[in-house]
Regions:
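Cap/insert and terminal regions of metallo-dependent hydrolase folds
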Residues: 2-5, 9, 32-43, 47, ...
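Metallo-beta-lactamase
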Residues: 5-143, 179-247, 270-276, 328-350, 355
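Catalytic core of the metallo-beta-lactamase
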Residues: 103-107, 205-269, 284-286, 290-294
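Divalent metal-coordination and catalytic microenvironments
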Residues: 106, 116, 154, 212, ...
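Acidic/histidine-rich helix-loop elements
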Residues: 119-136, 220-227, 280-289
Length: 357
């Protein structure tokens, strides 16, 4: 493929994961949500309080035409076999199974929770172009246990995969939990879905033992050309009898403000799932994706005993090599005095039984 066609297709495929939605036209009404103005909603679009917005269109062009993009292999196999999860994990135990990129299965308190599930081959609005996975999902879809909850952090294609949500609805009829506005998107593909939405600070109680908290993160959203930041993005805190899990799908570090706030509100975490890939070039990605050093600092700031690192090694969204996050993470852990065993760079199919406090 020549450079011009590569640019065209890769930019289309990155519409909602690395800046393509910067083409967005201004609108006087949100496509997804109508509600009162707040400290992070202007009546049409959501925003990061006190933070910088995503890079502009000229920055996108500069990056895509002039960036030094590493070539990923067509296959980057996981060292782990396909996982076959147990039906349920009860009580205070917490078991994490990594599906790939930003997709997790969390099992605790008898609940089976999927986060940002993606089983599709491409994280793109197109079946023929855009980021393509270089390893298969770590759990075969047919081997999933009964799924009770599906948490969707935001609407970028590498986190909200409509085809996967359709399959989950048919097979499991789960409850979907997602930030404001994303329910409208999900219903375009799964009209009969059970969905609960929330704003930052809201809580959804699930049964008698699990709560899902919506917390801020520094990011943005878009599915296409005219809906930039019209649906909210969020981190989640899963609170159960075994402690609290802090899950961030995507975030810029933003001086660690949200990590500080999470610890102040929730105390220390038994586990945090933190992104540490898709971060180059820094001049363009810094406001939306933290790098490995920032992820380690975030771990320390939020008081996480253990971290499952994600958002790397499955689909190429940005310029760094497929294994660059690993080397950068190892350096950051040494420089910041964190034991390597506490921050696990997850691979598809990997299973982690989280130690108790």
């Amino acid at each position: 493929m020549n450079r011009r066609n590569f640019f065209r297709f890769s930019t289309l495929g990155l519409l909602a994961v690395a800046g393509g939605a910067l083409f967005a036209r201004r609108s006087n009404a949100s496509a997804y949500y109508s509600g009162p103005i707040s400290d992070h909603f202007d009546g049409v679009r959501f925003f990061n309080p006190g933070g910088s917005p995503p890079g502009n269109f000229m920055g996108l062009l500069k990056w895509r035409f002039n960036g030094e993009r590493a070539t990923w292999p067509e296959n980057y196999p996981s060292p782990f076999p396909f996982a076959k999860p147990e039906m349920r994990i009860g009580g205070k135990d917490i078991r994490v199974t990594f599906v790939g990129h930003a997709s997790f299965l969390i099992q605790t308190a008898g609940m089976n929770i999927l986060i940002d599930p993606v089983w599709s081959q491409r994280t793109s609005p197109f079946s023929f172009a855009g980021p393509k996975r270089v390893n298969p999902p770590g759990i075969r879809f047919e081997d999933l246990p009964p799924i009770d909850l599906v948490l969707v952090t935001h609407n970028h294609y590498d986190h909200l995969d409509m085809e996967t949500l359709k399959r989950l609805h048919v097979a499991h009829k789960p409850l979907f939990i997602t930030p404001l506005g994303n329910d409208a998107i999900i219903r375009t593909g799964v009209e009969a879905a059970r969905i609960k939405v929330g704003d930052w600070g809201d809580v959804v109680e699930v049964g008698s033992s699990v709560k899902i908290h919506f917390e801020p993160c520094h990011h943005w959203s878009a599915r296409g050309l005219n809906d930039r930041s019209m649906a909210l993005w969020a981190a989640f805190v899963i609170e159960g009898p075994g402690g609290k899990i802090y899950h961030i799908g995507d975030t810029g570090f933003h001086e660690g403000l949200n990590y500080h706030a999470a610890r102040k509100k929730h105390g220390e975490f038994r586990l945090a799932n933190l992104p540490f890939g898709a971060y180059e070039p820094r001049w363009f990605m810094k406001g939306q994706h933290q790098n490995p050093a920032e992820a380690v600092e975030g771990m320390k700031l939020c008081g996480a005993a253990h971290v499952c690192g994600h958002h790397w090694g499955t689909v190429q969204l940005t310029d760094e090599a497929v294994d660059a996050p690993l080397a950068a993470l190892k350096t950051a852990l040494v420089e910041q005095g964190v034991e390597e065993s506490r921050f696990r760079p997850m691979r598809p199919g990997e299973v982690f039984d989280v130690p108790s406090a």
